[in-house]
Amino acid sequence: DTGYLPPETYHYAEKLIDNLSLEVEVLQSELSPARMEAKYGKLWETNKESDLDKYHELRKIRPLEIGLEKYNISCWASGVRSSQTENRNKMKFLDIIRKRFSLRPLLNWTNKDIFYYMEENNLPAHPLFIKGYSSVGDWHSSSPDDIETKGRDTRFGGIKQECGIHTNN
């Protein structure tokens, strides 16, 4: 939880947690959003890749690593798909990321595969999907698809498509 997710994402997460009876531990930065902004400014507004790297390190990568370390996790799974970005198209089903195995069971799934899986398992769509978003992240760096941009191209103003969680960079 970066502290910057849209309200719809928090509501959606709670709905899934309740409907599926999930036990979830929310991981967050040790630095509150307000403190981070006071120290570094709104890193997503500068249009500098280095500032986005700092933002991702503080809000995403470090909290995930702390959580994985806390529970001594040696392998974790993610829902990345090869069709999402050029970088993800080069990924393997199992890889080592920051000294841990990263399992990508959905790597070759298509949008159609996702749709039918969700239908067959009565999983609700993210509410922003109905509003034209095909990729949802933080409120300040996600936007609905349009004629020229869609998917992860809408993220971070088109400057970056990856936050660093799924890469060794």
Predicted segments, located by residue:
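Nucleotide-activated chemistry modules centered on ATP-dependent adenylation/adenylyltransferase
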Residues: D1-N169
